[in-house]
């Protein structure tokens, strides 16, 4: 079938990429199944908000910098503010949201801003990007299991439609809530409260 080394290499790359996509999908489905049936035990502890999110930003900052994405971090909570949370699962939340931002970033000069706000008895986290945005009729469904917007279904971006539903489940299991605002061509903001 492969009449040249170039074609063979192309086929091998395609097979490799599809196998990786399948592996990622299986892992997401397995995790979602466990979290949906409450089989993932949470390890809740007191977390210093400022330190935790500073560390998260440092971790994702290297990858974003390598991709040419500008990362802004704005902490508006006092240094001693604490929340009760599962640090590992909150990291999954941050990574899934930023992963989505990266996947649908359509600007040459991509920007992701993370803001931490004190809203009375709660901490609100906002992750904003300047990607392609989400249409208003699709916005209410982005946290639904397996939902993908029309534009993402017709793209080569991959994705299973599970990532943001995992994020929602984790936030709700923490007693919080999550929502999104977006403007087509301008970007999306994901907000959650703990």
Residue map of PLM features:
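Conserved micro-motifs of the catalytic ATP-binding
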Residues: 3, 37-42, 80-85
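Short alpha-helical segment of the dimerization/phosphotransfer core of two-component systems
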Residues: 17-22
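A conserved beta-strand-to-alpha-helix junction within the catalytic ATP-binding
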Residues: 43-61, 116
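Short beta-strand/loop element within the Bergerat-fold HATPase_c
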Residues: 111-121
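Acidic ATP/Mg2+-coordinating residue in the GHKL
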Residues: 129
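Short conserved segment of the HATPase_c
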Residues: 134-148
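Conserved glycine-rich
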Residues: 175-176
